[in-house]
Amino acid sequence: MQDDTIKLLRECNAGIKMGVSSLDDVMEHVQSENLRNLLAQSKETHTKLGNITHEYLRDYHDDGKEPAAMAKMMSKIKSNMTMNEENADHKAADLITDGCNMGIKSLYKYLNQYPAAEEKIKKLAKDVAEAEETLVKDLREYL
């Protein structure tokens, strides 16, 4: 049970870090103030969820997990190449939507992979997925 709990927490931790990093990568290029505010609000939500994740990891005496270096590097390269084009708001919404969809898919994969995780940690993972789903819906008008 504890093993599944820690593994699920680590995946949540890495995913949240990746999400915050991606939001940072695109926010500076966004032209619409409304979109910038939406992304900033999502970053704040992800940061709060990340802080909760860190508290749980400390309780289990675990340092967490960093996003895969290659995935992080490829995300940054894609963001930088794409955001240098015109229609920055559309491109930002597109990139973040893709990232959210990957995050949602991964979270549910890990929820299924670690069924013995504690309920409070499963709830946290579902809260992260819900935050991603909300952002995807909110970004639709910018696609």
What residue spans do the PLM features occupy?
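Alpha-helical bundle segments that constitute or directly flank the non-heme di-iron/ferroxidase center
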Residues: 2-30, 91-115
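Alpha-helical scaffold segments that form or flank carboxylate-/histidine-based iron centers
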Residues: 4-12, 33-51, 89-95, 119-131
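Short phosphate-engaging motifs
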Residues: 19, 35, 49, 103, ...
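Charged/polar positions within long, soluble alpha-helices
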Residues: 21-28, 51-58, 79-82, 86, ...
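Conserved alpha-helical segments that form or flank metal/cofactor-binding pockets of metalloenzymes
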Residues: 37-70, 139-143
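Carboxylate-rich helix-loop segments that flank metal/cofactor sites and access channels
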Residues: 55-105
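Preference for long, well-ordered alpha-helical segments
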Residues: 92, 99-143
